[in-house]
From Swiss-Prot:
Domain of life: Bacteria
Residues the record marks as active site: 86 (nucleophile), 176, 178
EC number(s) per entry: 6.3.5.2
Native organism taxonomy: Bacteria, Pseudomonadati, Thermodesulfobacteriota, Desulfuromonadia, Geobacterales
Biological pathway: Purine metabolism; GMP biosynthesis; GMP from XMP (L-Gln route): step 1/1
NCBIfam families referenced in this protein's UniProt entry, alphabetically: guaA_Cterm, guaA_Nterm, PRK00074.1
Species this chain originates from: Geobacter sulfurreducens (strain ATCC 51573 / DSM 12127 / PCA)
Protein name: GMP synthase [glutamine-hydrolyzing]
KW Membrane (keyword) present: no
């Protein structure tokens, strides 16, 4: 009998915090399913969702402002445990008669949280010798305690940093347990969802695969599915998962646009067609893409040209597959959240999301998105469980337009060939030196400028390659990776000696912000 992995679930109500997705990821790491919804989710919808616990996120507003975001008051009478984080704690405090005012001294950054009184069940294992380092980000604080609550923790600047009413299973923390800067934060969230809410931890890779396979079979029946395979993590895992469910009913279309990494097309075919037995149609479209991109230097126009041509080619190939009624995409949960935010206007939208996107409506294909409940780290775990090569599953992000936006300015075959060889050397050396898995994203960039050099007794006038490597948790902010000088020297030497047309290599030490991770 299969496990229903959605019976135990946590509801996270979002008040606009930049960290809300991290809350969801921490809950998932405790092997418990959760969903993010806007703060004004109606009470009937919440009852229908039937959460085993509710988490109120932080947010940029002040609870005492006119029109400040709030929940329906009856939410606290549902009889399920509630954890308020930052703004969520202040909202809960105000609801139960407490007072929230601007702090005399705001707290942003690291702070030492000190136990006050007897910590309740939420704080088991959280304090060590009566204290715990935490991450603060607030300008308001609770000045008068809500009725029925006890103070559990304080800092040197704020006397009320954690509160509890164990009789009603209501808890609040002023700090952010979801961020990595709160070292034992995952313990607190795990305790809340497992011990206080009573979840048993059914959200595991094996159970997720079993559930997805059953749902795909129920949705698709005996109909045929097509999927645009890019070689990226999301589409690769989606392909492996769907193939496990319906076998030869899946056909993948792999468009080789000539802007992939070195030997990437052959690797994709070897992994899927040869090893996993997936039916893959490979389309060699390099010349069509290069022709379409000729003389175009604007990054956004290049993206549109590449995206539109992909759709055109995908449509051509799909029309040849008889009986296909489903289009599969590697949409993941952050894509769903961003799209929902863009539609409702209740979340700050950083970018518009397009997957296979923009397929003509007249194709009349039904949409199959087996990964839409999963975060990227969960997708990777599923990929490993499905038997995909670790190097494919944990590969760094690669932009949809490929090398088209890592070649600055106009795209030419000569430039793409130089860049993919330089990039391959760079990545190979990062693996060899043990850096690759410590870096969030690393890649080479082709600069369409020439510099003077000397090789042997002769003068050279050749191109420049820039190397980029960053560390980040969320890709919203990023710091440059401190690659040791000896490794920089070895990588630079290999690229200049082995890649014809390059005589200079530079290393990008810009953080995000102000720079972006990609150059275009």
């Amino acid at each position: 009998m299969s496990t229903d992995i959605h019976t135990e679930k946590i509801l996270i109500l979002d008040f606009g915090s930049q960290y809300t997705q991290l809350i969801a990821r921490r809950v998932r790491e405790a092997h418990v399913y959760c969903e993010l919804h806007p703060f004004d989710m109606g009470l009937e919808a919440i009852r229908a969702f039937a959460p085993k616990g509710i988490i109120l996120s932080g947010g940029p507003k002040s609870v005492y402002e006119e029109g400040a975001p709030a929940v329906e008051e009856a939410l606290f009478d549902l009889g399920v445990p509630v954890l308020g984080i930052c703004y969520g704690m202040q909202l809960m405090s105000r609801h139960f008669g407490g007072e929230v005012v601007p702090a005399g001294k705001r707290e942003f950054g690291h702070a030492d949280l000190l136990a006050a009184g007897t910590p309740g069940p939420l704080f088991e294992g959280f304090f060590v010798e009566g204290k715990s380092p935490v991450w603060m980000s607030h300008g308001d604080h609770v000045s008068r305690m809500p009725q029925g609550f006890q103070v559990v923790a304080e800092t040197a600047n704020a006397p009320v940093c954690a509160i509890q009413d164990t009789a009603r299973n209501l808890y609040g923390v002023q700090f952010h347990p979801e961020v990595n800067h709160t070292p034992r934060g995952e313990i607190l969230i795990d305790t809340f969802v497992r011990k206080i809410c009573g979840c048993t931890g059914q959200w595991t890779p094996g159970h997720i695969i079993e559930d997805a396979v059953n749902r795909i079979r129920a949705q698709v029946g005996r109909e045929r599915v097509i999927l645009g395979l890019s070689g990226g993590v999301d589409s690769s895992v989606a392909a492996a998962l769907i193939h496990r469910a319906i076998g030869d009913q899946l056909t993948c279309v792999f468009v080789d646009n000539g802007l992939l990494r070195l030997a990437e097309g052959d690797q994709v075919m070897a992994t899927f067609a040869e090893n996993l037995g997936v039916k893959v149609i490979r389309v060699d479209a390099e010349q069509r893409f290069l022709t379409a991109l000729a003389d175009e230097a604007d990054p956004e126009k290049k993206r549109k040209i590449i995206g539109n041509l992909f759709v055109e080619i995908f449509e051509e190939e799909s029309s040849r597959i008889e009986g296909a009624t489903w289009l599969a995409q590697g949409t993941i949960y952050p894509d769903v959240i961003e799209s929902a935010g863009a539609k409702t206007g209740k979340a700050h939208n950083i970018k518009s999301h397009h997957n296979v996107g923009g397929l003509p409506e007249y194709m009349k294909l039904k949409l199959l998105e087996p990964l839409r409940e999963l975060f990227k780290d969960e997708v990777r775990a599923i990929g490993e469980e499905l038997g995909l090569p670790r190097q494919m599953v944990w590969r760094h992000p690669f932009p949809g337009p490929g090398l088209g936006v890592r070649i600055l300015g106009e795209v030419k075959k000569e430039y793409a060939d130089i860049l993919r060889r330089a990039d391959a050397i760079y990545i190979e050396e990062l693996y060899a030196a043990g850096h690759y898995d410590k870096i969030s994203q690393a890649f080479a960039v082709f600069l369409p400028v020439k510099s003077v050099g000397v090789m042997g007794d002769g003068r050279t006038y050749e191109y420049v390659i820039a190397l980029r490597a960053v560390e980040t948790k969320d890709f919203m902010t990023a710091g440059w990776y401190p690659l040791p000088y000896e490794d920089m020297a070895r990588i630079s030497g290999r690229i200049i000696n082995e890649v014809k047309g390059v005589n200079r290599v530079v290393y990008d030490i810009s953080s995000k912000p102000p720079a972006t991770i990609e150059w275009e």
